[in-house]
């Protein structure tokens, strides 16, 4: 099983459809998208290039808890500009390690500096769960 995981790449499990928001939008705009799409994270783009990320946690900590007006606050003020990312050909193991080392729940996937996808803890958990189940099934047949 370890070999299967070692051979797998981020591109094998990343989400290719990433919901984004333009940099000039407000925190209110972001909150509406998060609610409507039932997601907790957006990639912030400028001219179709990722420039940051914003999460529900950012909104709670930097806007709600600080009593800041979400309707007039630009995303640039609260987004994380130094977001962590991986390339599609990165190993699953290296993606997990990057998440653990940086205490984060998701990674943006960039290919040639362009947004290619996103990978989350949930994606990784489902991938590992499926590998464990397959491995257990194979072992039970032997």
Regions picked out by a protein language model, each given a short descriptive name:
Residues 1-142:
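Tandem CBS (Cystathionine beta-synthase) repeat/Bateman regulatory domains
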């Amino acid at each position: 099983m370890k070999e299967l995981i070692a051979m797998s790449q981020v591109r094998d499990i990343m989400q290719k459809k990433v919901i984004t928001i333009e940099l000039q939008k407000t925190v209110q705009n972001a909150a509406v998208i998060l609610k409507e799409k039932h997601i907790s994270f957006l990639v912030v783009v400028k001219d179709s290039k990722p420039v940051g990320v914003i999460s529900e946690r950012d909104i709670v900590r930097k806007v709600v808890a600080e009593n800041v007006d979400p309707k007039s606050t630009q995303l640039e003020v609260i987004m994380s500009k130094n977001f962590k990312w991986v390339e599609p050909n990165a190993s699953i193991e290296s993606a997990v390690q990057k998440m653990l080392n940086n205490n984060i729940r998701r990674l943006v996937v960039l290919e040639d500096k362009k947004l290619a996808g996103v990978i989350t803890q949930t994606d990784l958990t489902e991938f590992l769960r499926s590998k464990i189940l397959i491995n257990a099934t194979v072992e039970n047949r032997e």
